[in-house]
Structures are given as C-alpha cells and as structure tokens.
Amino acid sequence: FKRIENRLVGGDDYHGTDGPLYLTTADCDNPLFDTLFAAAKEAGYPLTDDVNGYQQEGFGPFDRTTWRGRRWNAARAYLHPVMKRPNLTVQCGVMVNRIIFEGRRAVGVEIRRKGRTSIVPGDEIICCGGAINSPQLLQLSGIGDPERLEPLGIDMVQSLPMVGEN
C-alpha cells in the first residue's frame, strides 16, 4: 500500500508519499468524535492514532482518499492519466463473460453488450474485477479448481484450486 499512497501529512513505516492515490486524515476535532472515542475507550476498545499503522485495532482518526474536497479513487489516480494511450481501450456498459486463451496465453475477452456477444482481441489482458469478479472471471475462463469447473462444462486452462478461496 505504501507505493500507491501520497499521504499528505507525510510518510512513515506504514504510509507512502510518492504514489498517485492521495490520502488525507479525517479531521476528528469536534464533539462528535470526542464522544465516540470516549465511549469506545469506556467500552474497553483501544484508541489508536492510525488505524492503518502499527496498532490497527481500535478507534481513531481514519484515512480517506480525498483531494481538494473530492474523492480520489483508483480511476483518478491510475486510469484517467493514461486514457489517451493508443494501446488502451476502456469500454463502459460491457459485461466480460470470459477471457479467451490460446494455450495458456490470454488473447482476448468475450464480452456482452446490449444483449450481443462478441470477441475483443487484445495483446494484453488486465483482469481487474475486484475481490469477487476477478476470481469469478478466472473460473469462467478455465482457471481454477477442476473439480468445480469441469462438471460445469468449462474447459480447463490451468488447475489452480485456490482461485476464489480467499
């Protein structure tokens, strides 16, 4: 995480300052937070100055990815700066059904848009569907546990039984 962070209050052993994702610490200097932290302490919870630092358990100021009053997300940090690259295609309103392989090499994706299925070739395929959809997409593409995929008629590309188990 250190490499992605640009923590505006400075870096330390747990936070970076050179990454593209702006990170600010919430201003907790108000009666609501004072009351919340006092109640947490009274209930036996630890207090911490940095919930993403050494002592993660407990209550304390939280970091947020904001910059100049706007949420600063992964799209703003990574995608928007490279949108004009000739080797990048971003399509919205598209469902990716599976990754197309030739042997073990990804050569495209099968997509569905407005009820129509088509194949989009690509020299580089980036699987970035998050914690749920990335393993699902890999499994639908034949990467995963053969005991699960073969009964569904999915041709195996690579036996990796732990895909989807995290």
PLM feature segments, named:
Residues 1-106, 110-112:
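Conserved redox-cofactor binding core of oxidoreductases
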Residues 99, 108-166:
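Glycine-rich loop(s) and the adjacent beta-strand/alpha-helix scaffold that form part
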